[in-house]
């Protein structure tokens, strides 16, 4: 390919062809050689923005590669697509909807979309009023007791985002009139819920039914179980449901039909995708945990990234760089798995959140025009809190046969903020934070440089099974500290990274048709398992055999 390219002027060759040529040309290039050739490589391949530092110098890229990645973005009309996203255009082409999660974090004084901003803030104010009432101990259950436990019942975007943020910002939990605990339930099998209900008192427990469609069977089956639990303890009175349930949905009529009082119904819109919805009233558990000011800081951090994404050239645009590095690794270096490694235990659920954000958005094989994709799309996204991962799967990263790209994430400061709870242990905990940071830097260094990172004397007689090849690419994202504002920034960076990659691949990141059919097939099988139907003739042999075992008709 590279020989044929040389026959034509550079500007006439497509960026994709040029990138393939660069892969061939630099196929044996090692990250350590890139650093040896550029003494100021860190300065050239890092971006500082607000409370963030993004270092991408440990990727297998050169200036020529970056130039062609930017050219690829231009040929895909990325700037135009960013403008379309931040309008009310129906960029979700299969469902004929806009994708306006960015509108959920617009400041109240934002003048470009006055009606949209007013709509959003009306619902946020209703949510804030409920938060204040619960925090003050003024919201009472059916027996008049103060609410002390709130259980969020949701799944997917109604669970992963709120749970991730609530856990990540545990240091910022606000004081309330009476201690308030927030819990999350998502699994449809009932085990999670069963374990939790044993710990709760019906009189002091409030449930949030969080479902965009108010038709998700996972969520409604859990909601029905807790309704029975409440009514068994408190009686079958209208006031039980009206006092102990809050609904968050696009479907006011369905919430009313279920029995939720109008004052306890928080609304969102069909232009908010579930996995992009934590900024809306789906984020009610977040606001209950970190308070109204904290929630507003979360929104402000995301809005700052929205502005950065729209108004910054590609060369300094962090979401664009994150996306294009992913394209380079996935589509040209054939690195089809990506690990997310936060070095902070508070980000325990961040990788799981990103799995949905990235793989449900970009796990597609059909382009916007209905044709099969021309490039591989989303890689497998996985990860774990870094120090734990070191004792689980870093062996594979360092000495396995799989090429893996990584994101290392860490806060620069901890245990020195006003919200720090354990002042008496501050010195020891600061040392522990430094221990985590040193491991974060050491692991990214060893992955990149391999044996080069070792002491030369140590390397001299080192057996091959103790050696490291290196050349595994990674980015490092440093936050000044992990707080509501910086977490809002971090999440929005990944949201926009996903969008940029969808533009390059020409796919719709805002639908999830692959999820729908499995639910429909489950609806067809449920009557068989419940004994209401017994015709198995249309099923495949495997499913028939498994159903017979489940029904006890044959031995397992």
UniProtKB/Swiss-Prot annotation:
InterPro entries xref list: G6P_Isomerase, G6P_Isomerase_C, Phosphoglucose_isomerase_CS, SIS_dom_sf, SIS_PGI_1, SIS_PGI_2
Its EC number(s): 5.3.1.9
One of the GO BP terms on file: gluconeogenesis
Subcellular location: Cytoplasm
Annotated catalytic residues: 360, 391, 519
Any single GO CC term annotated in Swiss-Prot or TrEMBL for this entry: cytosol
Domain of life: Bacteria
Reactions that this protein is recorded to catalyse: alpha-D-glucose 6-phosphate = beta-D-fructose 6-phosphate
Pathway linked to the protein: Carbohydrate biosynthesis; gluconeogenesis; Carbohydrate degradation; glycolysis; D-glyceraldehyde 3-phosphate and glycerone phosphate from D-glucose: step 2/4
Pfam family, one: PGI
Xref: CDD domains: SIS_PGI_1, SIS_PGI_2
Sample GO molecular function, one term: glucose-6-phosphate isomerase activity
Major location category of this protein: cytoplasm
Keywords of this entry: Cytoplasm, Gluconeogenesis, Glycolysis, Isomerase
Top-level EC class as recorded in UniProt: isomerase
Biological function: Catalyzes the reversible isomerization of glucose-6-phosphate to fructose-6-phosphate.
Family to which this protein belongs: Belongs to the GPI family.
Protein name: Glucose-6-phosphate isomerase
Source organism of this protein record: Acinetobacter baumannii (strain ACICU)
């Amino acid at each position: 390919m590279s020989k044929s390219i040389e026959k034509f002027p550079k500007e006439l060759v497509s960026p994709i062809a040029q990138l393939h040529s660069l892969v061939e040309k630099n196929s044996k290039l090692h990250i350590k050689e890139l650093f040896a050739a550029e003494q100021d490589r860190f300065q050239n391949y890092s971006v500082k923005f607000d409370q963030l530092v993004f270092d991408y110098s440990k990727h297998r890229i050169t200036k020529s590669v970056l130039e062609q990645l930017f050219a690829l973005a231009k040929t895909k009309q990325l700037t135009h697509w960013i403008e379309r996203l931040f309008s009310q255009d129906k960029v979700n082409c299969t469902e004929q909807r806009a994708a306006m999660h960015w509108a959920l974090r617009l400041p109240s004084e934002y003048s470009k979309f006055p009606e949209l901003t007013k709509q959003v803030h009306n619902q946020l104010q209703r949510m804030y009023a409920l938060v204040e009432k619960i925090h003050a101990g003024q919201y009472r259950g059916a027996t008049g007791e103060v609410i002390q436990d709130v259980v969020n019942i949701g799944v997917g975007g109604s669970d992963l985002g709120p749970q991730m943020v609530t856990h990540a910002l545990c240091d910022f939990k606000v004081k309330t009139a009476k201690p308030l605990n927030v819990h999350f339930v998502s699994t449809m099998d009932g085990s999670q819920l069963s374990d939790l209900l044993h710990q709760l008192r019906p009189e002091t427990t409030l449930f949030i039914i969080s479902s965009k469609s108010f038709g998700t069977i996972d969520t409604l089956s859990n909601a029905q179980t807790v309704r029975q639990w409440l009514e068994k303890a408190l009686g079958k009175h209208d006031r039980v449901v009206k006092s102990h349930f809050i609904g968050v949905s696009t479907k006011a009529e369905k919430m009313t039909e279920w029995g939720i009082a109008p004052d306890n119904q928080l609304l969102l819109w069909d232009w908010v995708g579930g996995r992009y919805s934590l900024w809306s009233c789906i984020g009610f558990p977040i606001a209950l945990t970190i308070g109204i000011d904290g929630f507003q800081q979360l929104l402000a951090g995301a809005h700052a990234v929205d502005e950065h994404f729209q108004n910054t050239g590609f060369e300094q645009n962090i979401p664009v760089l994150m996306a294009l590095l992913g394209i380079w690794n996935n589509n040209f270096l054939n690195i089809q798995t990506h690990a997310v490694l936060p070095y902070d235990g508070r980000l325990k659920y961040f990788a799981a959140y990103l799995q949905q954000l990235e793989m449900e958005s970009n796990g597609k094989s059909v382009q916007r025009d209905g044709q099969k994709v021309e490039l591989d799309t989303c890689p497998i996204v996985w990860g774990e809190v870094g120090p734990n991962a070191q004792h689980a799967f870093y062996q594979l990263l360092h000495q396995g046969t799989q090429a893996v790209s990584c994101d290392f994430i860490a806060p620069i400061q901890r245990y020195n903020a006003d919200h720090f709870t354990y002042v008496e242990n501050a010195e020891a905990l600061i040392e522990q934070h430094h221990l985590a940071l040193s491991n974060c830097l050491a692991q990214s260094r060893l992955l990149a440089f391999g044996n080069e990172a070792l002491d030369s004397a140590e390397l001299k007689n080192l057996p091959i099974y103790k050696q490291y090849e290196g050349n595994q690419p990674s980015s490092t994202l440093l936050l000044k500290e992990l707080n509501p504002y910086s977490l809002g920034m971090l999440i929005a960076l990944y949201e926009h990274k996903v969008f940029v990659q969808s533009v390059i691949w020409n796919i719709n990141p805002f639908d999830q048709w692959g999820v729908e059919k499995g639910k429909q097939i489950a609806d067809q099988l449920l009557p068989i398992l419940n004994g209401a139907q017994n015709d198995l003739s249309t099923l495949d042999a495997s499913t028939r055999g498994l159903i017979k075992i489940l029904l006890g008709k044959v031995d397992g």
